């Protein structure tokens, strides 16, 4: 099972060094863990987890103020990227056109892409979730070999309100009809609900936000998944 930690706008270079030290001391070679860190916390050290980028601009380098490109990611050996997270779609206004440009650039370079999709509460309550997700995935090549799709219902992100196991199973089952890529769930995942989520047939892992920001909490979540699978 894959465990992806999205640290978002949390951790400094110093605090992440301590975070990484705790993970490295407790993870095993069998654990499939990735951590998406703030740019300032990138390091070139060997870890028992994979480092990933929360964002990038589809360029090697150039006149793109405030952005980071392939040249900077290459310096740290980073080749795993998040694309389409709802906070970048909703708060920062990333368009489908930009998301497609990011996807195409990442795919051209053979990067691992974690492509995030998810509906807001109004779409969910109107029963339009599946068609909404079909449209979002229609923007990319779902046959890309190094693709992972993360389903994150917007109404569950950072709210403490996770989708039910039945809801997650239904949506991941639907997404399986659209792609053969590994499927993840994200949205208020924690140590208390990971066991139930881990038992969902099409769930290949989780994209964890708040519950991953503390290294010990994240390790407890991983351990809880083993106990309850």
Curated annotation (Swiss-Prot):
Pathway: Carbohydrate biosynthesis; gluconeogenesis; Carbohydrate degradation; glycolysis; D-glyceraldehyde 3-phosphate from glycerone phosphate: step 1/1
GO biological process: gluconeogenesis; glyceraldehyde-3-phosphate biosynthetic process; glycerol catabolic process; glycolytic process
EC nos: 5.3.1.1
Main location, first listed in the record: cytoplasm
Keywords for the protein's UniProt record, in alphabetical order: Cytoplasm, Gluconeogenesis, Glycolysis, Isomerase
UniProt cross-references to HAMAP family, sorted A to Z: TIM_B
Protein name per the record: Triosephosphate isomerase
Enzyme class name: isomerase
Signal peptide annotation: none
Its biological purpose: Involved in the gluconeogenesis. Catalyzes stereospecifically the conversion of dihydroxyacetone phosphate (DHAP) to D-glyceraldehyde-3-phosphate (G3P).
Quaternary context: Homodimer.
Localisation: Cytoplasm
Catalytic reactions of this protein: D-glyceraldehyde 3-phosphate = dihydroxyacetone phosphate
Species lineage: Bacteria, Pseudomonadati, Campylobacterota, Epsilonproteobacteria, Campylobacterales
Family, as annotated: Belongs to the triosephosphate isomerase family.
Residues involved in substrate binding: 6-8, 158, 188
Active site: 85, 152
InterPro entries named in the record: Aldolase_TIM (IPR013785), TIM_sf (IPR035990), TrioseP_Isoase_bac/euk (IPR022896), Triosephosphate_isomerase (IPR000652), Triosephosphate_isomerase_AS (IPR020861)
Keyword Isomerase: yes
Molecular functions per Gene Ontology: triose-phosphate isomerase activity
């Amino acid at each position: 099972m894959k465990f992806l930690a999205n640290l978002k706008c949390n951790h400094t270079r110093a605090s992440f060094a301590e975070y990484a030290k705790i993970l490295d001391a407790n993870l095993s070679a069998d654990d499939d863990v990735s951590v998406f860190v703030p740019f300032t916390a990138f390091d070139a050290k060997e870890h028992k987890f994979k480092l990933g980028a929360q964002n990038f601009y589809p360029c090697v380098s150039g006149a793109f103020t405030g952005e980071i490109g392939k040249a900077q990611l290459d310096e740290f050996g980073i080749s795993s990227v998040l694309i389409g997270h709802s906070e970048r779609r909703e708060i920062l206004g990333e368009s489908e056109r930009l998301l497609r440009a990011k996807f195409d650039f990442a795919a051209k370079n053979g990067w691992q892409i974690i492509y995030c999709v998810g509906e807001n509460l109004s779409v969910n309550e109107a029963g339009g979730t599946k068609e909404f997700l079909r449209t979002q995935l229609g923007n990319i090549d779902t046959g890309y070999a190094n693709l992972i799709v993360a389903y994150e219902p917007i109404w569950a992100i950072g709210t403490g309100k996770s989708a039910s196991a039945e809801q997650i199973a239904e949506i991941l089952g639907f997404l399986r009809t659209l792609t053969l890529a590994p499927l993840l769930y994200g949205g208020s995942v924690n140590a208390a609900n990971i066991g139930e989520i881990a038992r969902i047939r099409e769930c290949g892992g989780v994209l964890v936000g708040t519950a991953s920001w503390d290294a010990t909490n994240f390790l407890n979540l991983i351990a809880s998944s083993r106990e309850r699978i």
